[in-house]
Amino acid sequence: SFGSCSPNPRRDAPLLAVRVLGIESSCDETSASVVEGDGASATLRSLAILSQDVHAIFGGVVPEIASRAHLTAIAPVARQAIADAGIAQDAIDAVAVTNAPGLVGALLVGVAFAKGLAATLGVPLIGVHHMEGHLFATELEDAAAAPPFTALLVSGGHTLLLDVPEWGTYRMLGATRDDAAGEAFDKVAKLLGLPYPGGRHVEAMAATGNPRRHRFARPMLNAGQRPGDDDYYDLSFSGLKTGVLHAVRDAEARGTIDAERPDIARGFQDALIDTL
């Protein structure tokens, strides 16, 4: 589980600057970057990303296709990241790689490549939990984004609310009981006949929608809940998705679906964001 990640080294000990090549292949994007840091601060030296557009025709990620695409892309993407950082390959001090969670086959491609590269260079290999990577990325944007803080992690497959007293220590406050927020966006996009990945398309359509035409229930926001209840911070989006399905079917039966799509998109987006 996310809460069982191993603690990271103390941040207050002085360290020499090191360069780490990071590799990510947990889903449908192959990416690599070089990060340079001294334990107190870090700088993103490069970032190379290759998205897999092939999944659009299927309306979602096909694991086998994702794994094969990673096999083709991972070496060129890593080389590009090193070149963009303006360093030689032997200047890499460590290799970090996403090792969970994600699509098993996709993860295996990244981990196998990272293991081979680390062994070739004779440098340490560091496994990184995908969700912990999201947390640490905030410091690359804002050096002041250091614990203690409360974190809301919203990604394609996860929606988590965490208490972060220090790096490496995480307490789960709440999580989705079913669909993640990103997953709900993709599924609703499909119901509305929009391309994959659906988030940006739902957002664009919702921008022209009437917020009062379709007001969907805000899941898990019950008046009877009190702080301290086990489910106080939990989320649920499957019911919201079902509400959208019924709204689409009703509009189709009335023959007004084309006119109502933006209103349905707006109602869904408002409900999900209000819930978060």
Where are these regions (language model features)?
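A contiguous, well-structured pocket-lining segment that forms one wall/lid of small-molecule binding clefts
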Residues: A204-T275
